[in-house]
Amino acid sequence: MLPDKKLGSPNHRFHHWLVRQAIAALDNAQVSAQAIESIEKTYFDGGKIAPDSQRGVNTYNYFKSTLERELLKIKFNLARFNATNLLNNSEDFQITEAEIIVKLDAIEKIIAKYRFSEDLVEVDSQSSAEINNISPKRSNFFNIQRDLSAQDEQKILQNLRNLRLQRRIATRFLIVLIFIPLTVQILTKNLVFAPLVQHFRVDIVAWEKIHYQEETIEHYFEEFARYKETLEIKQLLSENQPLNQEKIHQELKKKAEELIRQAATNSQQGIVNLLADIAGLVAFVVLIIVFRGKSIITQQYLSQSFLALNDITKVFIFILLTDMFVGFHSAHGWEVVLENLTSHFGLPENRHAVYIFIATVPVFLDSLFKLLIFNYFTRQSPTSVAILEKMQQ
């Protein structure tokens, strides 16, 4: 028998822990599925928890939060089960593969009916196109000049429910997209990467092995020169016995070491910021991938909200955004942004690179942004294009 298969070996204990985690995740997912099934049998006659059931919308709204919470638990626990099962190459499962399949089938039987409707009640493509093409001025129901049949009224009410549901989902998802990556960035920066990089601090390295670019320590040279001049002025104006050259040399050496250590610390802090930003970006991408349905709904809602604006407002937003890239006021703004970025990542400030960036990149972004917006306006709002052309003339 191989050594890593011995009972009590670290590898065996690790695989045993993975097995227990996988079984626990699968059991938790099954418990959540059974909770949904219990609500279905008790209050919805064994059918789907939906607003169009015999119980009505009020009962559905009461159990909606419970349904969403249990579905989220199932998704999370199944992801845990798949991840631990992927990492575990051991066959030391406490339950057989047949029992796992039975549990997965039982869970799938319950959640399958909510797979495509948990985020949004689907509307047929024809009715969605009709909603998108309705002008905001004509979307007021008090201005409809025709008689509505019962079927038309039900369709309109269903569309309104879908819009309210879209707004709720989009608002929550946008809040999650903002706060979760920020939280991950802050926590990883202070709890993970900062202590890790601290092991490579500069005070354990010989000074002779430290090399910096001239741009990096130019600021510290200026600060050292000011400190030296201040020390000389204090010595000249002091009524006490002036410091000897050896004492002055010690003070200057102490200040130089402090500034070099500060420069190295700032450089290390840039590495910490870079790693933390990458962690926040990874969290953002994971949220987009895991909640792909919600991201699509949010995109559709934002697009519909923008199209619902009047043409003058659309053109104003377009001009405002394009002027942010190129304009008499934007050059200094780009300088401030680039200086903050270089300081954030601990990079040396290069004025020539900043000027080249300002002379090329904003112009390219402005042209690309105008092309995309014109293409979008031409397809979705031709009137806005006409208004914009008149304003430019």
From Swiss-Prot:
Keywords in alphabetical order: Cell inner membrane, Cell membrane, Hydrogen ion transport, Ion transport, Membrane, Transmembrane, Transmembrane helix, Transport
A GO MF label: proton transmembrane transporter activity
Membrane topology: Multi-pass membrane protein
Phenotype seen when the gene is deleted: Reduced H(+) influx activity following dark to light transition leading to a delayed transition from H(+) extrusion to H(+) uptake. The double mutant missing both PxcA and PxcL is impaired for light-induced H(+) extrusion and later exhibits lower H(+) uptake activity. The double mutant missing both PxcL and FlpA has both reduced light-induced H(+) extrusion and later lower H(+) uptake activity.
Record's GO cellular component terms: plasma membrane
UniProt subcellular location: Cell inner membrane
Broad class of the protein's primary localization: membrane
UniProt key word Nucleus: no
Transmembrane segments: 173-193, 271-291, 306-326, 354-374
PANTHER family reported for this sequence: CHLOROPLAST ENVELOPE MEMBRANE PROTEIN, CHLOROPLAST ENVELOPE MEMBRANE PROTEIN-RELATED
Stated family: Belongs to the CemA family. PxcL subfamily.
NCBIfam families for the chain: PRK02507.1-2
Function: Together with PxcA, contributes to transient H(+) uptake following dark to light transition. Required for H(+) influx to activate the Calvin-Benson-Bassham cycle. May also be involved in CO(2) transport.
Name the record gives this protein: PxcA-like protein
